[in-house]
Design a protein with these regions (language model features):
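Membrane-embedded catalytic scaffold of the fatty acid hydroxylase/desaturase
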Residues: 53-66, 73, 81, 85-240
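Membrane-interface helix-loop junction between the first two transmembrane segments
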Residues: 25-46
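A membrane-cytosol interface segment of integral membrane proteins
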Residues: 238-274
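Membrane-water interface of transmembrane alpha-helices
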Residues: 19-32, 105-115
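Short, strongly hydrophobic alpha-helical membrane anchors
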Residues: 1-9
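A transmembrane-helix-recognition feature enriched in membrane-embedded lipid enzymes
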Residues: 45, 218-226, 256-267
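Hydrophobic core of alpha-helical transmembrane segments in multi-pass integral membrane proteins
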Residues: 15-25, 59-60, 67
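Loop-to-helix transition at the N-terminal end of transmembrane alpha-helices
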Residues: 11-15, 39-53
Length: 274
C-alpha cells in the first residue's frame, strides 16, 4: 500500500508538471483559440500553478499519514482484493470502468449539489482555459474525491503496475483535454468516441450553464453518451466560445487566496453578479 501510494504520487507529479510545460509550448504552436495564444497571462498561470503545487503537497502529506498508519496497513493486507492475481488487462479494464464511473457521478454531484458547486466553481472560474486549468481545484474538493476513490480502489486490490498504468492514462488525458490545443476536425471526431478531447471538454467550461452542466467525463465520454449528458458545438464555433462562468469574471477573483476562500464567501461574492 505504501509503495503503491508513493509511486502514484511520484508518477502524477512528474507527468503533471512535465506535461504542463510541454503542452504550454505546444499550445503556442497549434492553438485552438488563437486570441488566447497571443497573450501571456503570467498572473493567471502563477495562480493556477500555485494551487496545483499546494494541492500536491497536501496529497503528499495525506500519503504520509496513510502509509504510516498501522490500522490502514492491516486493513489493506486483510482486505478482499478481488483484482489481485487477475490478468493485468482485465484488471485494468475493471479499474478504468469503476473509477471513471465514480468520477463521472461525483462530477455531476459537484455541479448539482449547491455546497459542492461552491468548491468546484474554483475550477470553472478560469476565464481562459488551457493546460494550467487542469489542476486548478479547491483543496477540499480534492479531499472529498480522494475520500471516495481511495477506499474503493484499495478494496479492489489491483496490482501496483495496473493502477500506475491507469493513472498514467488518466493524468495524460486530463492535461490534454484542458489544453488549448487544436486537433484536426476528423481526428477530434474519431477520438471523442474513446477519450475526452480538448473540444469535448472545452464545452464543459463554457460560461453558458447549459453547456457547463454537460460533458462530465474525465478520461472517457462513454458515460456522458450513456446517460445523455453529452453536448456538442460546431467545430468552427469554438474560437468564439466564452469560457468561465457568467459571474465572478474579475481577474482578482482568480487569485489563490480568493479561490481558497470562495466557498466560504460565496453568497457575498455572488451578490456582486460580476
Amino acid at each position: 500500500m505504501a509503495l503503491l501510494l508513493q509511486q502514484r504520487v511520484l508518477v502524477e507529479l512528474v507527468l503533471t508538471f512535465g506535461g504542463m510545460v510541454l503542452l504550454m509550448m505546444a499550445e503556442s504552436v497549434v492553438p485552438r483559440v488563437r486570441t488566447l495564444a497571443e497573450t501571456v497571462p503570467v498572473a493567471r498561470w502563477l495562480n493556477n500553478w500555485a494551487l496545483a503545487v499546494f494541492n500536491f503537497f497536501l496529497v503528499l502529506w495525506l500519503v504520509y499519514l496513510l502509509t504510516s498508519s498501522e490500522l490502514v496497513t492491516h486493513w489493506v493486507s486483510t482486505g478482499p482484493a478481488p483484482l489481485s492475481g487477475m490478468p493485468p488487462l482485465v484488471a485494468f479494464v475493471v479499474v478504468f470502468l469503476v473509477v471513471e464511473f465514480l468520477v463521472y457521478a461525483l462530477h455531476r454531484a459537484f455541479h448539482q449539489v449547491p455546497w459542492l458547486w461552491r468548491l468546484h466553481a474554483v475550477h470553472h472560474l478560469d476565464t481562459q482555459v488551457d493546460v494550467t486549468t487542469s489542476h486548478r481545484h479547491h483543496s477540499l474538493e480534492l479531499l472529498l474525491v480522494m475520500a471516495v476513490l481511495i477506499p474503493v480502489v484499495t478494496l479492489l486490490g489491483p496490482e501496483p503496475l495496473v493502477l500506475l498504468g491507469y493513472f498514467v492514462v488518466r493524468v495524460t488525458v486530463i492535461l490534454v483535454s484542458h489544453s488549448n490545443l487544436r486537433l484536426p476536425r476528423g481526428l477530434d471526431r474519431v477520438l471523442r468516441w474513446l477519450v475526452v478531447t480538448p473540444d469535448f471538454h472545452r464545452l464543459h467550461h463554457a460560461a453558458d450553464r447549459r453547456h457547463t452542466d454537460s460533458n462530465y467525463g474525465t478520461v472517457t465520454p462513454w458515460f456522458d453518451y450513456l446517460f445523455g449528458s453529452a453536448t456538442d458545438l460546431p467545430y468552427g464555433e469554438h474560437d468564439r466560445l466564452v469560457t468561465g462562468l457568467e459571474y465572478l469574471r474579475d481577474t482578482r477573483d482568480s487569485r489563490v487566496d480568493r479561490l481558497m476562500l470562495l466557498p466560504f464567501r460565496w453568497h457575498r461574492l455572488r451578490s456582486r453578479r460580476k
